[in-house]
A protein has these predicted regions:
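Right-hand nucleic-acid polymerase module
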Residues: 1-139, 150-295
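Cys/His-coordinated zinc-finger cores
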Residues: 143-147
Length: 295
C-alpha cells in the first residue's frame, strides 16, 4: 500500500538506525497529544467531551515539559527495538505501601534495583537490562524492566518463587516476550496513558486517558537506565537519498510506513513533519545488491 505522505529525496533529514529499522524525519518529530490538553497544573480539557476536569494528583513535584518527555520516549522506543526480541524477559517491580505512604524517592528505587540486579546476575549470569520508571497518581513509583541474556536465552523464571523474593519490596510480574508482542508500542502506551479511575475520582467510566501519565513525571528525573552492553541507535544527518544509499537501499526506495505530525508553536504558527520508517533494512540491502549485480 502506497504511503499518503513522503519525504522528498533531496531534503536534509535526521536519520536513526536501530534494530534493522531506518527512521528518517525532516525535523525532530513532535507527537500530537489527542486525549487531553492541560490548561493549568491542576486542570485539563478532555478533548473527547470538551469538559474541563481536575487532575487527581497527589504528586506535587514540578513536572517535566511534554516536549522533553516525548523526545525521551522516542529515544526509549528506539533502544527497545534495537535490543529486545522474542524470548527476552519483561519485569514489573512494585512497592507495597503497608503504612500508606508512597515511595517517591527515585534514588531509593534505583538503589533497590541495583541490589536486585546483583542477585539476578549472580543466579543467571551476564545479562543486559533496560529499566523504566512509571509514576502513579499517588506519587509512588513502579519499575518496568526488559532483560536479555548477553549470549543465548534466559531459562524459565518463576515469578512467585524467584523474582518476587529476589525483589523483596512488593508485587512483581514476569513475562516472556512473544513473537507477536509489539513491546515498544505497548510499553510506550503503558507509560504514558492512565486509567480514568486513577485520575478522576469516583468515575465509573472504563478505559484510559491518552497521554495523561506524562503529567506525573517530575522534572530532573532520569526516566530510564540501561546496562552498558545495550546497542545504541546510530544517528546521522544528511540528504535522504544519500542516507538510503549509505544503508544499501535504492535512492528511490519507498518507506514501509510514513506519518505526518503537526505542532503549534507559541506564536500560533504550525510546524509539520513527516517521519518515514524502513523495516528489515538488511534484507532489502541484499535484495537491492542482487538486483544491481543482475543489471
Amino acid at each position: 500500500m502506497e504511503n499518503k505522505y513522503e519525504l522528498e529525496k533531496n531534503i536534509t533529514v535526521n536519520a536513526y538506525y536501530y534494530g534493522n529499522v531506518l527512521e528518517m524525519t525532516d525535523t525532530n518529530p513532535i507527537s500530537k497529544q489527542s486525549g487531553i490538553r492541560p490548561i493549568s497544573k491542576d486542570e485539563y480539557i478532555d478533548l473527547a467531551t470538551g469538559m474541563t476536569m481536575k487532575f487527581n494528583h497527589q504528586n506535587k513535584q514540578r513536572i517535566q515539559s511534554p516536549e522533553n518527555l516525548r523526545k525521551t520516549f522516542r529515544n526509549l522506543r528506539r533502544l527497545i527495538i534495537a535490543n529486545f526480541n522474542a524470548g527476552d524477559i519483561w519485569l514489573t517491580l512494585t512497592y507495597r505501601q503497608d503504612d500508606g505512604r508512597p515511595i517517591t524517592d527515585t534514588k531509593r528505587v534505583y538503589r533497590d534495583f541495583k541490589v536486585f540486579w546483583r542477585r539476578f546476575v549472580a543466579r543467571y549470569g551476564h545479562c543486559d537490562y533496560l529499566i523504566v520508571l512509571e509514576p502513579q497518581a499517588s506519587g509512588s513509583w513502579h519499575l518496568h524492566g526488559l532483560i536479555k541474556k548477553q549470549k543465548g536465552k534466559l531459562p524459565f523464571i518463576d515469578n512467585n518463587l524467584v523474582v518476587e523474593p529476589m525483589w523483596g519490596q512488593g508485587f512483581t510480574m514476569t513475562k516472556r516476550l512473544k513473537d507477536t508482542d509489539n513491546v515498544a508500542s505497548y510499553l510506550m502506551a503503558y507509560l504514558t496513558d492512565i486509567p480514568k479511575d486513577e485520575i478522576i475520582p469516583g468515575t465509573s467510566k472504563k478505559g484510559n486517558i491518552k497521554g495523561a501519565r506524562l503529567h506525573y513525571y517530575p522534572s530532573g528525573v532520569h526516566i530510564y537506565r540501561g546496562s552498558r552492553g545495550l546497542r545504541r541507535p546510530v544517528k546521522k544527518k544528511g540528504v535522504k537519498s544519500d542516507i538510503l544509499f549509505d544503508y544499501g537501499l535504492s535512492r528511490d526506495a519507498k518507506a514501509d510506513a510514513a506519518f505526518y505530525h503537526e505542532h503549534k508553536i507559541k506564536n500560533g504558527k504550525k510546524i509539520s513533519h513527516i517521519t518515514e520508517f524502513y523495516d528489515n533494512v538488511n534484507n532489502k540491502k541484499e535484495t537491492n545488491q542482487a538486483r544491481q549485480d543482475h543489471d
